[in-house]
Amino acid sequence: MLRGWLRLLLDVVFPATCEGCDTTLPAGHPSCLCDACKAALGRAEGSLCERCGVPVASDSPCAACRTRPPAFGRARAAGWYVSGSVLASAVQSLKYRRRRHVADALGAHLAAHYPFPTDVVLVPVPLHPARLRARGFNQALLLARALGRRCGLPVASRALVRRRATRAQPGLDAAERRRNLRHAFRVRTPGAVAGRRVVLVDDVLTTGATADACARALLVAGAMRVDVYTVGRAP
């Protein structure tokens, strides 16, 4: 009870602001997003490629997935990651402003849009140790934990590791991204994923190259199937 009163007092003295639009939140507001921004997070829907989730004319696989099927079974996102959108602002606040609590709101948004089977294990996309030290946390792990709490699912936080540093992906085409990520990941604890259905968790899916490389490593380690779920998807 004392903790609750203390939180209310802090909200009055140091009012929280919405991570989507920077407006002041009411004291005791249960989320880091105002109601308008929560509603504006949106959903990635419409006719989507049945494999990678990119917008297509019909729900059949897109040309890229027909030409080179990804290792993962299915990729879906909670919303479209578009510059200037509430979702993009919230993700950037988490990653670059180090607002770790934003992961709870984004994890809840993802959980609200997809029914996750109870027999899956969540695996976050790992950061290289140098990047992890620089940032101080792995946003994919925070999202996986938030999703796990919401859905009652286990998180294999150390199952997948990034074995080498890679070039930054922006600016690389699809073929360059695949080469950049070749053999970049390995499964450190195969027992955590062998014979299991795995849900790979990350903040944003762009070309799917990172998800594909992770899925290949997980399948080699014995995972039965790998699906990918992210907060945002580049359209």
Please place each PLM-identified region on the residue numbering:
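Glycine-rich phosphate/pyrophosphate-handling loop used in enzymes and phosphotransfer proteins
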Residues: 1-235
